[in-house]
Amino acid sequence: MTVTVRFAPSPTGQIHIGNARTALFNWLFARRAGGSFVLRFDDTDVERSRREYADQIEIDLAWLGIKPDLTVRQSERFGLYNQAVEKLKEAGRLYPCYETAEELELRRKIRLSRRLPPIYGREALKLTEEQKAAYEAEGRKPHWRFLLPNFDSDPFSTGRTEIHWDDVIRGPQTVDLASMSDPVLVREDGTFLYTLPSVVDDIDLGITHVIRGDDHVTNTGAQIALFEALGAKAPCFGHHNLLTTVTGEGLSKRTGALSIASLRKAGIEPMAVASLAVLIGTSEAVTAYRDMEELAAHFEPASSSKSSAKFDPAELEALSRSLIQAMPFEAAAPRLAAMGVEGSIAEPFWNAVRGNIDKLSEAAEWWHIVMKGPEPTEFTEDDRNFVNEAFDLLPPEPWDRETWRSWTEKVKEKTGRKGKALFRPLRLALTGRESGPELADLLPLLGRERTLARQP
């Protein structure tokens, strides 16, 4: 069996790190098994779905290193769903209901007042053809419910009907179909709710494993029943824990600051996002891995906790920083070149500055300082005189890492300055900043000519 998984976002907004967690769980699961990854856009909600959101999702996934083997759109597959609807109707497994939302809410309250579970009582099954015609004459259109197999012969006499599956993340799971309402599969306007297209696509695309958030655990039972009603074997299921904000709120597409697009624009490294999204809330140590191969080697779905995990942006920033500061020049070179950081000193420059930056884009700022010089710096008269005296003591080239030590020793002997009084004015003159990379590393990159040009 070839493992085939899918990630099924709705293109109604930007995906966030919680969505990325699901995508990455699926991608890594397929990667380890030598399987396939399907990107399926759940865009049956034609009013809210936007192609620009779908395009952005593809960009976000590519940035994370996820390249689908197949991309499909539910909006192009309505014919398959209609065929499934007719099959279920013919089998007596899909029945029309005419209640309004207000009527259903009233029934729910009545059941609760009688200490009964607030599930649909299948009242629509009792409607005669005349009653249905009367409703339609009023202008009502039916929504269609899937008749769950939680009874022997009388649908009004339900009994405990257990659905079991061995969850690839949570282990053995059981749900009781008698504890849930018959799910609505088709709305009054003929559009489909999530469940039917999802199951039909999983069958048609040969999905072997459905890996998603644990908010879907309960409805897995109804979906397994729907697979069987359509004559198909249900795939394996896996349900990972969800991420929340640091305050415990659930993530949503409205949590814009946590969208993948915003994290990318903020300069966060993609492998920091991937590492944290996958490893947070598991028994694995949260470490920033350099690439997907490393992450896949440490990915263990069953290590996921059963409780939600809090996503802390500060932890993400720390992981991203650790990746930048450990990044070899070969990995950074293409991105540095795109910012104009290239040439014979690009590699020593990167090795000099990487330990002092949080985001790779900051390297461009230091490149400008090295090549063009800092903004003019204001000095006290004493510091200006000191810097000019120090610059008069600059040794001839060639310069290397020892040049800074030997130069500052001479300056110390000549001026009597030491410590901060010596180093701070020189750093400000050379870089315009109070802190930064080791000047022993920067000075050879500046060279004598560019250094003298910074004399105040």
From Swiss-Prot:
Keyword field contains Acetylation: no
Molecular function via GO: ATP binding; glutamate-tRNA ligase activity; tRNA binding
Any one Pfam family match given in the protein's UniProt record, by short name: tRNA-synt_1c
Listed InterPro entries: aa-tRNA-synth_I_cd-bd, aa-tRNA-synth_I_codon-bd_sub2, aa-tRNA-synth_I_CS, aa_tRNA-synth_I_cd-bd_sf, Glu-tRNA-ligase_bac/mito, Glu/Gln-tRNA-synth, Glu/Gln-tRNA-synth_Ib_cat-dom, GluQ/Sye
GO cellular component term, pick one: cytoplasm
Short motif 'KMSKS' region, span: 250-254
Reaction equation(s) it catalyzes: tRNA(Glu) + L-glutamate + ATP = L-glutamyl-tRNA(Glu) + AMP + diphosphate
Protein location: Cytoplasm
Listed GO biological process terms: glutamyl-tRNA aminoacylation
Keywords carried by this UniProt record: Aminoacyl-tRNA synthetase, ATP-binding, Cytoplasm, Ligase, Nucleotide-binding, Protein biosynthesis
Motif 'HIGH' region, residue numbers: 9-19
Source organism superkingdom: Bacteria
Broad class of the protein's primary localization: cytoplasm
Protein family: Belongs to the class-I aminoacyl-tRNA synthetase family. Glutamate--tRNA ligase type 1 subfamily.
Subunit structure: Monomer.
Record-linked PANTHER family: GLUTAMATE--TRNA LIGASE (PTHR43311), GLUTAMATE--TRNA LIGASE, MITOCHONDRIAL-RELATED (PTHR43311:SF2)
Name of the protein this chain belongs to: Glutamate--tRNA ligase 1
Organism: Chelativorans sp. (strain BNC1)
Organism placement in taxonomy: Bacteria, Pseudomonadati, Pseudomonadota, Alphaproteobacteria, Hyphomicrobiales
